[in-house]
Amino acid sequence: MNILIFGPNGSGKGTQGALVKKKYDLAHIESGAIFREHIGGGTELGKQAKAFIERGDLVPDDITIPMVLETLKSKGANGWLLDGFPRNMVQAQKLWDALQAEGMKLDYVIEILLPREVAKNRIMGRRLCKNDNNHPNNIFIDAIKPNGDVCRVCGGELSARSDDQDEGAIGKRHDIYYNTVDGTLAAAYFYKDLAAKGMTKYIELDGEGAIDAIKDKLLAQLS
């Protein structure tokens, strides 16, 4: 089973992706990790990408797409879930073409829907536990709201990451994601159009629900 997953920062995309990975024993591949592995490993593609990054330039698609494809082939023998790529419609088309050329199926595309303001509040509401960063605490989500100023799980001291409180940075990331013309949603909608033609399957999930409820709805649509 091969899956693409889309969702804005704050939508719970990472959480749902991890649950799907565990359920179906998929390789959970995140776009940033692809760059780090190729550059850190000194691959030819990694060297080319590094040269662009060091100049402060975007890495061209003719380098990025082969890097992504190579990782999917090497790590995704039992299936994969790709998170964080593609980020625009051009990349979506190129990735689709590359998958077709390799004879690789794209079984499902998942989009987690969440209003922009809700996504922003969720990011700004995240709190980190001093004892364990994996303890979920968010002042804007009732199910995981902390007990006052302490962790709901262990009572540990809480803090907020500085970048989670930077509304300007959050806004820039969301400007890219919610752009339906040449942003990430444009990429998602490219696959939605393919699904309408029966070429893949497109799953839309309401991201405002509880984690378990979203998971149950998602797993019910995967087969």
UniProtKB/Swiss-Prot annotation:
One of its GO terms (molecular function) is adenylate kinase activity. ATP binds at G10, S11, G12, K13, G14, T15, R126, G209. One of its GO terms (cellular component) is cytoplasm. Keywords: ATP-binding, Cytoplasm, Kinase, Nucleotide biosynthesis, Nucleotide-binding, Transferase. It is found in: Cytoplasm. Residues 125-164 are annotated as: LID. CDD domains: ADK (cd01428). Its main location: cytoplasm. Catalyzes the reversible transfer of the terminal phosphate group between ATP and AMP. Plays an important role in cellular energy homeostasis and in adenine nucleotide metabolism. Belongs to the adenylate kinase family. NCBIfam families: PRK14529.1. Consists of three domains, a large central CORE domain and two small peripheral domains, NMPbind and LID, which undergo movements during catalysis. The LID domain closes over the site of phosphoryl transfer upon ATP binding. Assembling and dissambling the active center during each catalytic cycle provides an effective means to prevent ATP hydrolysis. This is Adenylate kinase. The lineage of its organism: Bacteria, Pseudomonadati, Thermodesulfobacteriota, Desulfovibrionia, Desulfovibrionales.
